[in-house]
Amino acid sequence: MTWELEIKELELRRQKALKLGGDERVERQHRLGRLTIRERIEAVLDRDSFTEVGQLAGDAEWENGKFKDVAPAPYVMGLGKIDGRWVAVGGEDFTVRGGSSAGLARRKGGQGGFVEDMAKELLIPMVNLIEGSGANVASALKAKYKRLPARDGFERCMELLGLVPVAAAVLGPTGGGPAGRAVMSHFSVMVRGAAQLFAAGPPVVERALFKKVTKEELGGAHIAVDKAGSIDNGAASEAEAFEQIRRFLSYMPSNVWELPPLVESEDSQDRCEEDLASIVPRNRLKPYDMRRIISLVFDRESFFEIQPTYGRASITGLARLKGFPVGVVANNPLINAGAPDARDSNKMGHFCELCDLFHIPLVFLVDVPGFMIGPEAEAMGTLRAGMRAMHIGMKAKVPRFTVIIRKCYGMAGALTFVNNRLCYRMAWPSAEFGSIPIEGGVAAAFKREIESTGAPDRRLSEIEEEIRSYSSPFRTAEAFAVEDIIDPRETRPRLCRFIEAAQGYLRTTIGPVPLGGVRP
């Protein structure tokens, strides 16, 4: 006897699973301009690398003890490769109950499912392709009881954040648990216009708050990405979102016990760009393009910006020097003169923590007059957020290298280096430093003296000029209070040499990052 009948049933069940929620719902998904979950997995992974797990799970119909039909579970997951490296991948099937969770004995994925277990045990990155509404209130009719939300299994999501890279793409309307899972990632991206993110959707908002809003008004990318910063990046299409995930992972090790991957670079480490000698205006009040400096210093076309539309007075992203991954943190003088507010501080702190976890050295490009000031900045908690970012930076164990391009003042300037470990600081001739800018600082420190004269404006100018005469960066270098003054054109060669030299130390940092106490 053979098992031919059972093998035929297996093939039948597989074919039904491949049809997802049926032709009509698949066509509707396509009409909305969105891919199905199986198409998404195929698009984000290397060709023919996907091995599905749990394909037969679903809500089956039986008649007289014989299998009749099955509605697939609204989640597809398995093992695949991105750029030849293994990843765990999974996502909601919106064509089956809108991607809401299924009442299975064991979760396939989502919060605390098999796919998360696979990422943890195999120590491989986790890729979440998210489009779903989370819990389905109708499930109580079948179960005959209401369960506690603590069973949603976010514990595994939390564990993964300390072990392997986690990337998430929000690809359609997403609420509840899937929305929380999108945020519990190291990198997230959402499709503008097609995807929305919220804790609860419009029907719940209307019932609870008596407000009518559309999904886009509630949680479109203009909210989730640009204003709230809940999601890191926006994308114009699903294809672009997948490309961003692939690119993000290209800088990451597979887990915290590995170093980031080195790629072969044809960009000479000795490349010196003439434009760097003139890019900073002699007028210290005029802004310039920091992103242009980034493009000239780091390996060509290697900069991958993270959160470009949130916290716009700062710039964060991944790049390479001589093929080695580095994290770039820069001030943006085109926005608020580069002064970080609470949003910028949260952005920089999160990014530094990411780099520290995955053993990626940090390069700071500094032009900061201090933290953003004024009533609005104080009301949004800029000081506390700034100190939180400083706390993260001070406990980071990765090497850091600081290039002071122009201003470096106050606590925001101090955020860019540490005194308890090696921190190589090099300044351009355009650099200026201090605990507080001369403008405003003199008026505060010499208030009585200035007001007691018959010509306060003239005395203010005299004191400012006297202090400014001591502000040459060469005086600071004479005291070895800054390690080097360099020709701006030497920035890339210097950084390349130090990043390469740091690789031996990086090998001593592998493993999870210990907790550093309670953040401010």
Residue ranges and their predicted role:
Residues 1-520:
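Ligand-binding clefts of soluble mixed alpha/beta catalytic domains
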